[in-house]
Amino acid sequence: MKVRPSVKPMCDQCRVIKRNGRVMVICSANPKHKQRQGK
């Protein structure tokens, strides 16, 4: 999982969600696209 200051969907399968107050991107097609917003 990548931790980035700004998270963006990388493909059509990417979903932007909010978990425990953190913005995350999950992707069923490519797990490399997983991201979490952080410092």
UniProtKB/Swiss-Prot annotation:
The keyword Acetylation does not apply. Keywords: Ribonucleoprotein, Ribosomal protein. GO terms for cellular component: cytoplasm; ribonucleoprotein complex; ribosome. One of its GO terms (molecular function) is structural constituent of ribosome. SUPFAM superfamilies: Ribosomal protein L36. GO terms for biological process: translation. It holds the Pfam family Ribosomal_L36. Belongs to the bacterial ribosomal protein bL36 family. This is Large ribosomal subunit protein bL36. It comes from Oenococcus oeni (strain ATCC BAA-331 / PSU-1). The gene is rpmJ.
